[in-house]
């Protein structure tokens, strides 16, 4: 009976406390069910605190939860005072949140552009975050909050200060596992590791060359021809390159011309070999394979052997017949030398069996006794002795001049041609040999070429540089004095032999 009465009293007590407790629950949703059970147990008295801990308390909570739901469902909707409390509280809270959100949006939109970055109000620089913007603003304000306690250096960022402190401590935390290299920064170690690896990740897509560093690839693209040609829309670059090459070729030709003129101006320089152009077609039969292939040979010899040998050969031949000299030796120079004392116009003639055919010439009536029939036209077969005196040559020359009347008594520079009249030595460039109607040298194109004459050796030159080099061998005081060693010759034959043999070299030593 006592248990039944106790349960009945408990039920009546719970029914009376439901309206008050329901109002408290509706007013404060933050209270837990344990607090609600404490309020329920408070009506029971302190003697029942120990009894509530157990299965009975769980039953009470379940009954309370079911009854609470029934009360909320059975609550009439017409009573507007009780449900207005939570609704009005939530409205005030939402209004407060809206105010805070509006303030946040205004402050955020004022510094953030439409692209999602934050702009500096001083210079307008866009930053990706607020922290980056604050660090940037320190560059305007001069603020450096991070200071080194050892040397007093200040920095705008903490990372820079930590990196600076490593300089004092000597700490190098990033070490290479392949060598003894150590550094303070991770990116430096990454770049160092590429030196050990064979991998070259940066590759030129135009020529295929690969590099370990991006900077090396950029430097390569600046001079990569394939890349430069691909970047140009047209062939302007190639045309410009061809134009530059053409200019370089012309400049090279000018430099060679200057070098040739400088060599000609050196009066004390040794004579140099001259390689004749193959396009020249003269009335001589010569082999073009004798030309020098190495320029060093031309510089080392530096002597005009052919010009002197030709002078000795044709001056020792029969003086009363026209003569065209061929190179006597393979090392001789490919410059045909024509005697200036024979004013005969030469024309092109085909060679057959090594012997020249009849040459077309002007009507020159020479004495038959001066042209022996037993002697051929070849200069090597000329039987005239080289010991003939100059007077014999002069007499024969005067005999030819008187019969033909084709050569002037004086050269164009006013100097007499005969040896008995004193002659002065001049290094000035003489005009071409006597008038073109007396002696003609025709090239392959049929053009008449200029011929330059040495009055002392009576040698003709087709090239002015070779003529100048030859004239540099003559002395100033005496034309038959060697300008290189001072040796004095009695006549032009001895002088030519001295130059050809190079006797002055022994004297210099």
Swiss-Prot record:
Induction: Up-regulated by TGFB1 and 2,3,7,8-tetrachlorodibenzo-p-dioxin (TCDD) in activated AHR T-cells. It holds the Pfam family zf-C2H2. Residues 1-19 have a biased composition (Polar residues). One of its GO terms (molecular function) is promoter-specific chromatin binding. The modification Phosphothreonine is found at residue 326. Residues 1-86, 364-394 are annotated as: Disordered. The modification Phosphoserine is found at residues 22, 42, 378. Expressed most strongly in peripheral blood leukocytes, the spleen, and the thymus. Residues 452-504 are annotated as: Mediates homodimerization and heterodimerization. One of its GO terms (cellular component) is cytoplasm. Belongs to the Ikaros C2H2-type zinc-finger protein family. This is Zinc finger protein Aiolos. It comes from Homo sapiens (Human).
